[in-house]
Amino acid sequence: MTLSTEMSDASGLAEETDIDVVGEGEDDEEEEDDDDEGGGGRGGGGSRLPSSAQRRRRSYAGEDDLEDLEEEDDDDLLLASRPAASPAPPGPAPAPGTGSGGCSGAGAGGGAGGGTGAGTGGGAKNPLVKPPYSYIALITMAILQSPKKRLTLSEICEFISSRFPYYREKFPAWQNSIRHNLSLNDCFVKIPREPGNPGKGNYWTLDPESADMFDNGSFLRRRKRFKRQPLLAPHAAAEALLLRGAGPAAGAGDPGAALFPPPPPPPACGYGAYGCAYGLQLPPCAPPSALFAAAAAAAAAAFHPHSPPPPPPPPPPPPGAAAELARTAFGYRSHALAAALPGPLQAAAVKAGGPGAAALARSPFSIESLIGRTRGPAAAGAHVSSGAASGTAPGPGGGGCAVQAAAGPAVALTRSLVVAAAAAASSVSSSAALGTLHQGTALSSVENFTARISNC
């Protein structure tokens, strides 16, 4: 009884033990599955191997299952470690015991290698470095190296591209900058292309006065901005020509003579401002200095820029006008005096005839009337006969006027003529000023004049 009871108890314990072992195995499988899922969720960090405590509690019945699971876990670990170690440099595979530590070391090594490579690539020097020269310096270099010291825009760009790789790579962008610097800086002068020289574009050269534009001949620094001096004013150019003694011979080889011709000669009349009709025909005055003439022309143009040109001077009078004007003392003829007289007076004077009519016919202030050279032969004979009669008649003083005439006939005649002319001038001028002339005024003055001559 006792033996059977013990056997039954032993068999019960064995069954319980088997059940417990099977239960533990299932629990272990569940824990291993959880570990596998946790390792897969960590992205290849490696699954944990079952600990030794769990192995001790397992029974012999579940050892085969555990070995299969361990092999599967090893395969999963290898597969997970290969993608993580792929960016690392080739080397020995990490040991199974290293786990996630080997993967982290490989990742750190790969990161360090990548950082070193990036630093090496960024430290390399770029060959396309912009030259330290301005556009004016580049243009000056191109012009100075040319044989004729002149280049077109395309030739300047070609020189810069061949000399500097930076501008060769960026050619279309800076060509307009070269064109603008050529046009806006006074140190560059544009030269038109010759008619027989085919091609496109004008030539560009350096102004001769811009030689000291750069400091000590270095193109890195410009001393000052060059300003072209303005052209000489007309009066300054005329003064320069006068100082150099520019004449017909000198002006033939002087280019300035063509730019600034001498001023035109002044008019031949002495009274140019009022015209030649208001004065005598005098010899032309000396021409003014070219300096003053040019200055006067420039001042007139400055004050009256839109004024019309002055009218041409009137033509000079004929050569006989001076003699005619000198013959008539005050510039009017005898017909002017006759026209000033009323009609009845003119008719009476003509009908009366005699010396009064002759005196009225000619001007009383002419040289001929004063000297008496133009009298007719009848008047001259009457004057001689009256003089002879008066000379033969005895006077109260014994000799009378005959002695006086013999002593100084010319002086007496001159005095009488001057007195008569003065009296006639006063009477005629007053009458002409009043616009009226009484009948017989001119005739009475002439009769008094002839009576004085006859009395002498």
UniProtKB/Swiss-Prot annotation:
Positions of region (Disordered): 1-104, 303-322, 381-401
A GO biological-process term: positive regulation of gene expression
Annotated compartments: Nucleus
Biased composition (Pro residues): 86-95, 306-320
Keyword DNA-binding: yes
Tissue distribution of the protein: Predominantly expressed in the CNS and temporal half of the retina. Also expressed in the condensed head mesenchyme, metanephric blastema of the developing kidney, cortex of the adrenal gland, condensed mesenchyme at the base of the follicles of vibrassae and cartilage perichondrium of the developing vertebrate.
Keywords: Developmental protein, DNA-binding, Nucleus, Transcription, Transcription regulation
SUPFAM superfamilies given in the database record: Winged helix' DNA-binding domain (SSF46785)
KO phenotype (gene knockout): Mice show disrupted cell identity in the ventrotemporal area of the retina and aberrant morphogenesis of the optic chiasm. Their kidneys remain fused, have a disorganised ureteric tree and fail to ascend to a lumbar position.
CDD domains associated with the record: FH_FOXD1_D2-like
Function (record text): Transcription factor involved in regulation of gene expression in a variety of processes including formation of positional identity in the developing retina, regionalization of the optic chiasm, morphogenesis of the kidney, and neuralization of ectodermal cells. Involved in transcriptional activation of PGF and C3 genes.
Name of the protein: Forkhead box protein D1
Organism: Mus musculus (Mouse)
Lineage, broadest ranks: Eukaryota, Metazoa, Chordata, Craniata, Vertebrata
